[in-house]
């Protein structure tokens, strides 16, 4: 399955007691299908993967594959700090039916660029799934350079990158690597429209958890080079882009999800949204239904 358009980095709904919320998860999956997204990511950073048990990981991924697998890509977050553990997690995701592995650069250990090349080649060779690279140095402490991506893009089982550095120069460098076999995806909602107009394939979004139709519309218009309409939609979504960054992801978007009846809480060490941001959350939540309705016209 091709990787393009809007892909939602799914949050993981929890109940008030901290347990998984299977009903909330099904409602979130339904919302994404209704919004026409082109793919989803299960158990990535937005999904609080670091807090999930193996059994919870399996439950989330298996139920997502059962509900929407075969229609759109179901990517699984499988990146861990060690190569052997990342391979093991990727094989686990493959056995559960994921279409791709989204593999973040190894957090905390700060490998060299040569180390990244060796790491990703090993995962691509042994993990059993097509690999999508994921660069988010603000979270991992490791910045994968475009030259490193260029070397990895030649591997037949490395099929794309999620680049969360919203720098224009970085996007331009990665555009040179884009091909039918290698997708370039933005991981930054706020700069995605501009990047898609420049030629990248799509967006892996946080805000689309609550506004799948609206973010899909923005991405489609950007890909069609309808500049005026793209600017209009990007402007409507700008308050959501900004709000999702007022505290570490996924705290803000989970506050919005809670306000539309999906999920209740986060897991430590993340805390609920600070009270100072509650008025903004209430205001934005009140706009969600109208924006989703408008996106279908």
UniProtKB/Swiss-Prot annotation:
It catalyses: L-aspartate 4-semialdehyde + pyruvate = (2S,4S)-4-hydroxy-2,3,4,5-tetrahydrodipicolinate + H2O + H(+). GO terms for cellular component: cytosol. Pathway: Amino-acid biosynthesis; L-lysine biosynthesis via DAP pathway; (S)-tetrahydrodipicolinate from L-aspartate: step 3/4. Its main location: cytoplasm. Its EC number is 4.3.3.7. The keyword Cytoplasm applies. GO terms for biological process: diaminopimelate biosynthetic process; lysine biosynthetic process via diaminopimelate. Pyruvate binds at residues 46, 204. One of its GO terms (molecular function) is 4-hydroxy-tetrahydrodipicolinate synthase activity. Keywords: Amino-acid biosynthesis, Cytoplasm, Diaminopimelate biosynthesis, Lyase, Lysine biosynthesis, Schiff base. The record marks 45, 108 as: Part of a proton relay during catalysis. It holds the Pfam family DHDPS. It is found in: Cytoplasm. The active site is at 134 (proton donor/acceptor), 162 (schiff-base intermediate with substrate). Catalyzes the condensation of (S)-aspartate-beta-semialdehyde [(S)-ASA] and pyruvate to 4-hydroxy-tetrahydrodipicolinate (HTPA). Belongs to the DapA family. HAMAP family: DapA. Homotetramer; dimer of dimers. PANTHER family: 4-HYDROXY-2-OXOGLUTARATE ALDOLASE, MITOCHONDRIAL, DIHYDRODIPICOLINATE SYNTHASE. This is 4-hydroxy-tetrahydrodipicolinate synthase.
């Amino acid at each position: 399955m091709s990787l393009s358009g809007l892909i939602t980095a799914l949050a993981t709904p929890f109940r008030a007691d901290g347990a998984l919320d299977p009903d909330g998860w099904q409602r979130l999956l339904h919302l994404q299908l209704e919004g026409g997204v082109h793919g989803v990511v299960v158990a990535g950073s937005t999904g609080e993967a670091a807090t999930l048990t193996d059994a919870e990981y399996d439950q989330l991924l298996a139920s997502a594959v059962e509900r929407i697998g075969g229609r759109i890509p179901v990517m699984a977050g499988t990146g861990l700090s060690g190569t052997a553990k990342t391979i093991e997690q990727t094989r686990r995701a493959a056995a559960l039916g994921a279409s791709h592995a989204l593999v973040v650069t190894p957090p905390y250990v700060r490998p060299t660029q040569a180390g990244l090349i060796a790491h990703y080649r090993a995962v691509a060779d042994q993990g059993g799934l097509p690999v999508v690279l994921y660069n988010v140095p603000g979270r991992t402490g490791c910045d994968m350079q475009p030259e490193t991506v260029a070397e990895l893009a030649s591997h037949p089982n490395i099929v794309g990158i999620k680049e969360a550095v919203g720098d224009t120069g970085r996007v331009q460098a990665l555009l040179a690597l884009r091909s039918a076999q290698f997708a370039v995806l933005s991981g930054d909602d706020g700069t995605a429209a501009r990047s898609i107009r420049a030629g990248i394939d799509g967006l892996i979004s946080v805000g689309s958890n609550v506004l799948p139709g609206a973010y899909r519309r923005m991405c489609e218009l950007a890909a069609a080079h309808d500049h005026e309409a793209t600017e209009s939609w990007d402007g409507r979504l700008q308050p959501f882009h900004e709000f999702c960054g007022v505290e570490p992801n996924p705290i803000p978007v989970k506050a919005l999800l809670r306000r539309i009846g999906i999920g209740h809480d986060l897991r430590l060490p993340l805390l609920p949204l600070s009270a100072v941001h509650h008025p903004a959350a209430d205001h934005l939540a009140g706009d969600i239904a109208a924006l989703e309705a408008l996106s279908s016209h």
